[in-house]
Amino acid sequence: ADRALAFLRAASLYRAAIDLGAPSPELLYARLGQALANAGRGADAAEAYLQAASLSRGAEATELRRMAADHLLKSGREPRGLEILRRVLDDVGLRYPESPQAAVASIVWHEARLRVSSLNPPVRRAARSPRDPRLLARFDAAFTAASGLTTVDLLRSADFAGRALRLALDAGEPVRLGRALAVAAGNVAARGEPSRRRADTLVRASQRAAAQADDPHARALALLAAGFVHFFLGEWRNARASLEEAETVLRAQCRAVAWELANTQVWTCNALILSGELREATRRVPSLVEEARTRDDSFALMHMTYPACVTHIVADDVDAAWRVTELAAAHAGGAFTAFHWGAFISAASVERYKGDVRGAWSRAQSIAQPLESSSLSRVALVRAFSAYERGLSAIAAAAAGVDRTAALLSAEKLARRLSRDDIGFAPAMGHLLLAGAHSVRGDKPRALEALELALPLLDAADLGYLAACARTRRGQLLGGAAGRELVERSERFFATQGVVNPERCLAMSAPGF
């Protein structure tokens, strides 16, 4: 906070100098942009950079516009950021794919080239590599697109990540190479378990390049990439360790990294929630939300939708949870993005929690087609959690007699899909869904059998909260001393984690019983 305040004071001085008509206003605007970026005020920094660009020419103006686009995209101002980015791409001679098909074709082409390239030699010879300003400008533009589009357009982000890595390899410059490898690793890891080996290779190469460059930002991005790989594959605690280490480096050694910090914080909170550490997650979330509001950081606020929603649910504050989902839905707009997905998961959860099963079921049905046709459908974790959330809403509806036959068939289909999924935690969620469906059908033996299969898998997947829900449901069905022991164990979990209304949480996360 003290550092941010110091940068804001510096920004005030630059503004005063500009207002007084000091010479070289383009330089003052650029320094104003840097001070604001250092303070975490990305949108304001972008405006200052654009002012500097309007007073500059040639490559300098292009670079200032690139920095403006970077901060706009990473502070949640996607439409304007994309408009400026496309101009920058034109300036440096990079094509923007006009269709998803064009992006896929480019991804395939660049990945084929990269697979026959060594990731090590450029790092070893980097210190002797010539610096081609045009090549570096092309890399910087491609990297801005790759990182800035991750949330709003995964396909084009992956395309530019491949191009940025190819350019970094050609340039042989270790700082840029480390950054490119980190972003590429995150994109590859999103595809799930079949891409694990390639993602790990990219992370290790990113770490080597960062060490070669002795650059803290490249090192933080390598740690962030490692966190993403762990998270996308369901390794919540390993993800948290890497992400928290990245946050430490970013805070202590880097400037103008509000976007990177937001990513470490949001995904750490998600990892805490999924592993069942609800008390710690809900302790962190309010200050992070307030910090994002203070900075007017729409990106961070939108990314915090689910953690903020969970925080209010744990406190049994339904109205506050619903307000979070309404704000997210109002901001999302346009084509289906990660923001829409987060709003869907949050809203459906709140609807089930408060007993609006018809609303949750309707939402689950309406999301299927937009999700399937979006680039998010390429993300294994998104596919798995979407199937699970849709299945939960279907079971809750069927249990209440809403569209019972269709809802049960949908839930069972989604459960079978999860049971066959190669991402480690998905089968556990599939068995939990099947247990709910069997219970709605009145088949207690099969419900118990499904819960018996689900519980060890949930524990192995470190899905602590869902394991507690499944344990309660199994205990309720079993009855007797054994059943009471299971229920009491879950009650201790809910009490330890500060859950105010476990009964409603069970209706939300393990319906049908």
Residue ranges and their predicted role:
Residues L72-G162, A190-T201, G234-R237, A241, ...:
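Amphipathic helix-loop-helix modules that constitute alpha-helical solenoid scaffolds
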